């Protein structure tokens, strides 16, 4: 797995089992990027790219909100800032680094990471 630091985030990239194409490569971009490594995720043809969160309760929520349970952190509401960094710094660097095909790019995540991807 390739590990990069782009913007303020750690990025993990796992190449397809068939290797990178000579032309453009399809990709799946995932929030909670550490799951690619933890779950040993693989694909046959797409590059898996995971963005590791700095603070998922802040970065993956669209507005600030108090915690649901006492003793747990509040939701920070920094999704707009996270998306600006993703779109303006991280994604362009990944497109250049791995020749990603912007027409074949999926974006998703798990739980709050999925909310952030909508």
Sequence positions of predicted segments:
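Non-catalytic cap/lid and distal C-terminal segments of serine-dependent acyl enzymes
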Residues: 1-118
């Amino acid at each position: 797995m390739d590990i990069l630091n782009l913007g303020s985030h750690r990025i993990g990239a796992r190449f397809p089992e068939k290797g990178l194409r000579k032309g453009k490569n399809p990709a799946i971009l995932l929030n909670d990027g550490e799951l690619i490594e933890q779950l040993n995720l693989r694909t046959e043809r797409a590059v898996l790219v995971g963005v590791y969160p700095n603070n998922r309760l802040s970065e993956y929520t669209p507005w600030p909100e108090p915690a649901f349970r006492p003793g747990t952190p509040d939701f920070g509401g920094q999704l707009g800032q996270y998306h600006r960094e993703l779109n303006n710094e991280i994604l362009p660097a990944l497109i250049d680094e791995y020749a990603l095909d912007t027409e074949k790019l999926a974006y998703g995540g798990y739980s709050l990471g999925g909310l952030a991807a909508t």
